[in-house]
């Protein structure tokens, strides 16, 4: 099995690509979903965030106010680093757990959907391939304004908080251009999926795992024989 890092930019259409991959039966680990789970009410990350930022980031229900927290993240780099230092270790642990589960299920490759894959840098070394969902800057801006009901200035600020898509292009092994319609995007995803499925890059890990498993079985059998002698 090998890992494929999937990334994009805000409103570049990564969710569309993920939905197509899931339709194809691909294993996708969603870092954003995990990030929401690790800060649920009562979790260690939740307690640390409240301790650092105070009750002002909470809803009446006691849960984190994601809009307020998002405004902090996008407007203050130092506070963004604080939140990342709280949540990222727990996110990585859960991603590892899910990756191992897909390995035991026999998947040839697993997609790690990580919005800030190239910004964080630390995760790219684990990826056999990286995939970027791209769209032109004007399309990205218009999509974000429409999707989140933001002004042009607000949308521009949120886009500026991430590495520009054009800067990510040379960092990616594969690019899905999502500037057009869904059918065009789907064709690109199908082609890439076929290439990844036909790759033999998964074999070394499988062979190593099989060798280790065989060795453990032989060792266990030897111990059992001694016990019964």
From Swiss-Prot:
Gene3D superfamilies: P-loop containing nucleotide triphosphate hydrolases. CDD domains: DPCK (cd02022). PROSITE patterns: DPCK. GO terms for biological process: coenzyme A biosynthetic process. ATP binds at residues 8-15. GO terms for molecular function: ATP binding; dephospho-CoA kinase activity. It holds the Pfam family CoaE. Residues 3-207 form the DPCK domain. PANTHER family: BIFUNCTIONAL COENZYME A SYNTHASE-RELATED, DEPHOSPHO-COA KINASE-RELATED. Belongs to the CoaE family. This is Dephospho-CoA kinase domain-containing protein. The gene is dcakd.
């Amino acid at each position: 099995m090998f890992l494929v890092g999937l990334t994009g930019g805000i409103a570049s259409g990564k969710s569309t690509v993920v939905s197509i991959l899931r339709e194809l039966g691909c294993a996708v680990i969603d870092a954003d979903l995990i990030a929401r789970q690790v800060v649920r009410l009562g979790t260690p990350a939740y307690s640390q965030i409240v301790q650092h930022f105070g009750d002002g980031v909470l809803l009446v229900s006691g849960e984190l106010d994601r809009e307020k927290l998002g405004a902090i993240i996008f407007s203050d780099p130092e506070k963004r680093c604080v939140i990342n230092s709280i949540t990222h270790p727990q996110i990585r642990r859960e991603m590892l757990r899910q990756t191992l589960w897909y390995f035991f299920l026999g998947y040839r490759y697993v997609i790690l959907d990580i919005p800030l894959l190239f910004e964080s840098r630390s995760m790219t070394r684990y990826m056999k391939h990286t995939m970027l969902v791209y769209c032109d800057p004007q399309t990205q801006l218009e999509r974000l304004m429409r999707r989140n009901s933001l002004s042009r200035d607000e949308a521009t600020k949120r886009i500026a908080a991430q590495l520009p898509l054009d800067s990510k292009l040379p960092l990616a092994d594969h690019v899905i251009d999502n500037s057009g319609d869904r059918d065009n995007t789907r064709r690109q995803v199908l082609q890439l999926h076929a290439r990844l499925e036909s790759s033999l890059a998964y074999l070394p890990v499988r062979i190593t795992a099989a060798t280790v498993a065989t060795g453990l079985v032989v060792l266990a059998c030897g111990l059992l024989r001694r016990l019964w002698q």
